[in-house]
Design a protein with these regions (language model features):
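Long, low-complexity, Lys/Arg-enriched
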Residues: 1-8, 15-343
Length: 343
């Protein structure tokens, strides 16, 4: 046999030991095989004929040789031990949100054995990488909409927040810490727009760096504005000078503190700003073990507390998020596991 061949194992007749032996061969075998059961023409035991058995005549009169005869062969689903083991590994990877590992294992199985769930795992693997182009393409194939926030201008923020949550659940605390700053800046900016009516881009200039468009505060656009007066006054009180460079969460918090009267919102922003400043440099510039206790000791909050504050801040933005949206990865996992059970 070569890789293009499939072995057909007929378990319709023979002693019980012979049939069991063929089933064991299929279960333990590492080669492509199918277990075949052939029903009798009348659907029950054949009449036993031991004498005067004219093979040639019976073959000539065999109705199965007629065109259009019913196919009495039926494949018996009998997964190999290898398939069973690999699918259990796939399930374990999915339950810990390691979709690329699950996809790699799925690809080691024959394509016909994973047709029910392979595309869903691929969809999940691209989703966690924020590869929305391929996620959208795969949704067309799977017909499973995994993105609760559909707007292209808003979903990137929410999906990014979900990946932060996944890093926390997986105990990847260094990556969890490093991923906080981008979402904090984006959330603060969206909050400033929704709660205070201030659009940061109105006070910035665009520039290109390393082939990508960036932005920085524009001294010219800030001059003579209330926004400019607030940030300049804040730094002057500390004996410093506001430098109109990149936009940081600190700047956005200063503006929110001045223009918003919501004390709870300002406390949330204060907490996250302190978390960001107290621990991000530790993870970025030192070789150090970071645990949940490390985070608590340096910030006063466990990872789950930080994630809870990020979730709460979304409620101050213009992105409409239901509580169940935060469980969308678990819902996606249930869908994949369900499809694996429906093979």
């Amino acid at each position: 046999m070569d890789e293009s061949d499939t072995l057909f194992l007929n378990v319709s007749s023979g002693t019980p030991a012979m049939k069991s032996g063929l089933l064991v061969l299929q279960t333990l075998g590492e080669f492509p095989a199918k277990v075949i059961q052939v029903a009798t023409p009348v659907g029950k035991l054949n009449e036993q004929v031991h004498e005067g058995y004219d093979v040639e005549t019976l073959w000539e009169l065999d109705e199965d040789n007629q065109e259009g005869a019913q196919n009495r062969c039926k494949e018996i689903q009998c997964p190999t031990l290898s398939k069973i083991k690999k699918e259990e590994i796939i399930k374990k990877h999915i339950l810990v949100y390691d979709y690329q590992a699950a996809f790699d294992v799925a690809d080691s199985l024959p394509a016909e054995q994973t047709v029910q769930y392979r595309d869903l795992i691929y969809q999940a693997a691209r989703r966690v990488l924020l590869d929305f182009a391929n996620v959208d393409k795969t949704i067309q194939k799977t017909k499973f909409q995994c993105l609760p926030v559909r707007s292209s201008s808003q979903r990137k923020y929410f999906e990014y927040a979900l990946t932060i949550d996944i890093r926390l659940k997986r105990g990847e605390y260094v990556d969890f810490i490093r991923s906080i700053t981008p979402i904090v800046v984006d959330l603060f900016e969206m909050i400033l727009k929704k709660q205070c009516g201030i659009i940061v881009d109105d006070y910035c200039d665009q520039y290109k760096r390393a082939g990508q468009w960036k932005r920085m505060w524009s001294a010219k656009k800030l001059n003579g504005t209330e926004v400019g007066k607030v940030v300049n006054s804040h730094y002057q009180k500390m004996g410093k000078r506001f430098e109109a460079k990149d936009v940081y969460s600190e700047h956005l918090k200063i503006l929110t503190d001045h223009f918003s009267s919501d004390t709870h919102l300002k406390q949330l922003m204060e907490d996250l700003r302190n978390v960001e400043s107290n621990i991000r440099n530790l993870a970025a510039h030192e070789i150090v073990s970071v645990t949940d206790e490390t985070i608590k000791n340096l910030t006063g909050f466990y990872g789950r507390d930080i994630m809870s504050k990020i979730r709460e801040l979304f409620g101050y933005t213009e992105i409409s998020i239901r509580k169940e949206y935060w469980d969308s990865y678990d819902e996606m996992n249930r869908k994949i596991l369900e499809q694996m059970s429906n093979e």
